[in-house]
């Protein structure tokens, strides 16, 4: 757990000392498992991406479209509170996907990923993939606290959500190794200020690239796909401390 996270917990007026110790124990246990999973990812030769966003930002649609690229081979761990709908959508595109239903939990944890990882391995999906993509539970708060051992943490912000979210949810955007502004074809409809997002990201994480993406603009997806392939070639590993 990062010093910043620990200090934030200890200074939270809504948490008793007992509560703080419980939360610290949970997060520390998750960090240990995340480190173990990272070793397993590397052993399998997988480059792991953790996609986070609000519900309905377009994560699954983006993955469906990525499946059309012959040079981008991946399998997926899906996280949702209920239903297998997203995993089913991806399977129809020929993508090996395992659904994790969390019930009431608003995030995925490293121990949850382990079970899905083992199932994908048993199915032979890992050896056919260059990337393992984790589509986290739709939420701009909880997932940013849980390390999954990913090489990159990528945050989507959809245009209909508004351009003010970066500083409203700083913990999420501080962990981003890249930001996608999705549904970018609706920028004018919603008076969405891309410049505001860029300005706010300069304050939080200036090194994180920002991509404008729309399902109506195939080149925007191809540019992002090429970016991911390059990061894999570089073996870029996120330095963010959860």
UniProtKB/Swiss-Prot annotation:
UniProt cross-references to InterPro entries, sorted A to Z: CobW/HypB/UreG_nucleotide-bd (IPR003495), Hyd_mat_HypB (IPR004392), P-loop_NTPase (IPR027417)
Effect of inactivating the gene: Mutant has negligible hydrogenase activity and is severely impaired in urease activity.
Protein name (Swiss-Prot/TrEMBL): Hydrogenase/urease maturation factor HypB
One Pfam family named in its UniProt record: cobW
Stated role: Involved in the maturation of [NiFe] hydrogenases. Required for nickel insertion into the metal center of the hydrogenase. Is also required for maturation of urease. Exhibits a low intrinsic GTPase activity, which is essential for nickel insertion.
Effect of residue 18 to A: Decreases interaction with HypA
Record entry for activity regulation: Metal coordination and the nucleotide-bound state of HypB directly influence each other. Binding of nickel in the G-domain decreases GTPase activity and modulates the oligomeric state of the protein. Binding of zinc inhibits the GTPase activity. GTP and GDP modulate coordination, stoichiometry, and affinity of nickel, but not zinc. Potassium increases the GTPase activity but has no effect on the other biochemical properties of the protein.
Keyword vocabulary terms for this entry: GTP-binding, Hydrolase, Metal-binding, Nickel, Nucleotide-binding, Zinc
Listed result of changing residue 22 to A: Decreases interaction with HypA
Gene3D superfamilies, per database record: P-loop containing nucleotide triphosphate hydrolases (3.40.50.300)
Domain notes per entry: Contains a metal-binding site, which can bind nickel or zinc, with a higher affinity for zinc. His-107 is an essential nickel ligand only in the nucleotide-free state of the protein.
Similarity comment: family membership: Belongs to the SIMIBI class G3E GTPase family. HypB/HupM subfamily.
Effect seen on changing residue 20 to A: Decreases interaction with HypA
Region ranges (G-domain): 48-211
Complex and partners: Monomer and homodimer. Dimerization is induced by nickel, but not by zinc. Dimerization is also induced by GTP. Forms complexes with HypA.
Highest taxon, organism lineage: Bacteria
GO MF term (any one): nickel cation binding
Effect of residue 190 to V: Strong decrease in GTP-dependent dimerization, but does not affect nickel-dependent dimerization
Binding site for Ni(2+): 106-107, 142
UniProt: Zn(2+) binding residues: 106, 142
BP GO annotations: protein maturation
